[in-house]
Amino acid sequence: MTDNVFDVIVIGGGHAGSEAASAAARLGAKTALITHRRDTIGVMSCNPAIGGLGKGHLVREIDAMDGLMGRVADVAGIQFRMLNKKKGAAVRGPRTQADRKLYRLAMLAAIEATPDLDIIEGDAFDLDVVDGCVAGVIMKDDRTLKAPAVVLTTGTFLRGLIHIGSEKTPAGRVGEAPSIGLSATLARLGLRLGRLKTGTPARLDGKTIDWQSIGRQGADEELIPFSFMTDTITTRQIECGVTRTTEATHRIIVDNIMRSAMYSGQIEGVGPRYCPSIEDKLVKFGERDGHQVFLEPEGLDDDTVYPNGISTSLPAEVQADFIKTIPGLEAARILQPGYAIEYDHVDPRELTPSLEVKRLRGLFLAGQINGTTGYEEAAAQGLAAGLNAALRSSDSDPFHFSRTSSYIGVMIDDLTSRGVTEPYRMFTSRAEYRLSLRADNADMRLTPLAMRVGCVSDARVRRFTSYQAEIETCRALLQSLAVTPNEARRAGLNINLDGQRRTAYDLLSYPNYSFAALSDVWPEKLGMIGPKVAEALEIEAGYSVYLDRQASAIADQQRDEERQIPLDFNYDALAGLSNELKVKLGTARPFNIAQAAIVEGMTPAAIALLLVHLRRLSSAERNSA
């Protein structure tokens, strides 16, 4: 019997499930990962890439918490690039194309090497619920696995339905059956469900592409890893092809637009705004004479090519026709047609910031089930849900990511307070404090928190504390070195002759002075500082003026996040609150004052009233203790 008893059970072995299971096990919870097949753990169902704008920040944050995605991407990455590298550090996004096979095998190896983590092959059919709390998972073969905390990471499998033209196939992804039982379970629990859609392009045979006739894009000269624990990238790097659709392409698609599952009315679900199908592009941006297509090889020893930019749900024969009108693809052979897939999701406002279902203790949701799109968004939620599931299993306080200190916190707050009307994707523009939430400082922001929670390996603790000490020592050195304007001029630094002494740290905040320039002024002092620390301090100093201005706003936000509202708070009993707000707050059930403040119609007076009542409640609880 003890073989079927766990602290945490994770359902689903995709990007959310892998991170959730790993996170729970790292906290010492005896964890089970349920998946249909062991060899599908870590499968990249759509594009063969990790990271990007906003998404790369999430990967770095997952890594800072000792998660898996960054390290696995460093093993499998075959074209590392830093996006927006000519812009400010706050909006730069690390990205890599990935070898699908290498990524899957590296993720499986990482999961198998994790202590306290068992992989169970099978089909989770229902939840075991006792006295309003999760008690385990009921399998399709009638086995019952016991656990006080369960994480659902079902991806596109909840009543998944694939569309290729008018053809409809129940599936979670190509060749894999959907999950019907769990969708019925969620509906039975009274959770608000919706229907969303995503899509993928046809896969092409790289041997049939005319690579000589199209543009090429290669990796950066300097390969920058995702993980703090990766010293160098050793996997061979490759180029991808770049081409464009043509007027002939557009004509075929427009002539057949009503045969697309999206435009025939066959699909109910809403698709991702920022990853549109080629049909959507032509309907919404019909004035353009072409749309860029990136031809991304799916592996070092795989001839399959992913044509990024032409996701579609047109019939297979129409896909074949329009693909042949794209330069370089005139003779391309389709290995698998593109398709749209629609699936059920849960309104994420049903969740607390720990990603626990408000009305069912012990049930956590992560990934596309919460209305997001993308591997990185799913993995970040999996990390949060896995940590909190482990904490729930031991009756410990939950761990909440703040939107002031992480993109993970921004995403979870957006989801749980605002909900979704379309698949949610992370962008740097979603963060109010993005100048301080940079990809380059994810470790400094989050690893100390991870160390306090206890989900970090000894090896990472040693490496991070050494790096942190080096940063602090070098920062203090920069702040101790100072020059007058005349001394600076003699050293070749052109600053105002105002008689004011400036430290090396002050000078580093000027846009026209680099660490290398200051090293010429103080070669003996600064010449020995390594490039990684030098770059970190250069970026930090450059943003220091702006970050000082933001400090007050961040403190206010953190204070409001810390003022929690009981989930059973009786808004109807709050005299002075309008009936409209009583209804809206009762429906939204905000977790804290920060979430209450963004409820539609909320006023400063209503917030003040709520705060007064919460203080009275807190005082009464203290007096009765």
From Swiss-Prot:
SMART domains: GIDA_assoc_3. GO terms for molecular function: flavin adenine dinucleotide binding. InterPro entries: FAD/NAD-bd_sf, GIDA_C_N, MnmG, MnmG-rel, MnmG-rel_CS, MnmG_C, MnmG_C_subdom, MnmG_C_subdom_sf. GO terms for biological process: tRNA methylation; tRNA wobble uridine modification. One of its GO terms (cellular component) is cytosol. It comes from the Bacteria. It is found in: Cytoplasm. Keywords: Cytoplasm, FAD, Flavoprotein, NAD, tRNA processing. FAD binds at G12, G13, G14, H15, A16, G17. Pfam families: GIDA, GIDA_C_1st, SAM_GIDA_C. NAD(+) binds at residues 271-285. Its cofactor is FAD. Its main location: cytoplasm. HAMAP family: MnmG_GidA (MF_00129). Belongs to the MnmG family. NAD-binding protein involved in the addition of a carboxymethylaminomethyl (cmnm) group at the wobble position (U34) of certain tRNAs, forming tRNA-cmnm(5)s(2)U34. Homodimer. Heterotetramer of two MnmE and two MnmG subunits. This is tRNA uridine 5-carboxymethylaminomethyl modification enzyme MnmG. The gene is mnmG.
